[in-house]
């Protein structure tokens, strides 16, 4: 199963409604699960990103979930494929 790291940055709307972020995160986790995507971790951060998601599942399902999340207008996302050492070794030979 493929794994992805999604970097989260709040929009002005998302920052304005920061107190609602945990409830939105729970709703995302439930929707992702229903779509066949596993949310391995959901973390809020300080710095250039406001949060990080670690997701696993079929590429199209993961990207669909992330696109739906961004379409709500509270966050902007950047999704990166992620690999463990043995996966990278298999890719690079």
Can you say where each PLM-predicted feature lies in the sequence?
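A compositional/biophysical signature of low hydrophobicity enriched in polar/charged and small residues
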Residues: 1-93
């Amino acid at each position: 199963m493929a794994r992805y790291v999604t970097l989260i940055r709040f929009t002005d709307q998302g920052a304005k409604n920061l107190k609602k972020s945990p409830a939105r995160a729970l709703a995302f986790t439930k929707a992702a699960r229903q779509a066949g995507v596993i949310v391995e971790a959901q973390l809020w951060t300080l710095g250039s990103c406001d949060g990080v998601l670690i997701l696993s599942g079929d590429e199209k399902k993961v990207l669909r979930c992330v696109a739906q999340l961004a379409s709500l207008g509270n966050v902007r996302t950047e999704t990166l494929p992620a690999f463990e050492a043995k996966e990278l070794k298999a890719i690079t030979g």
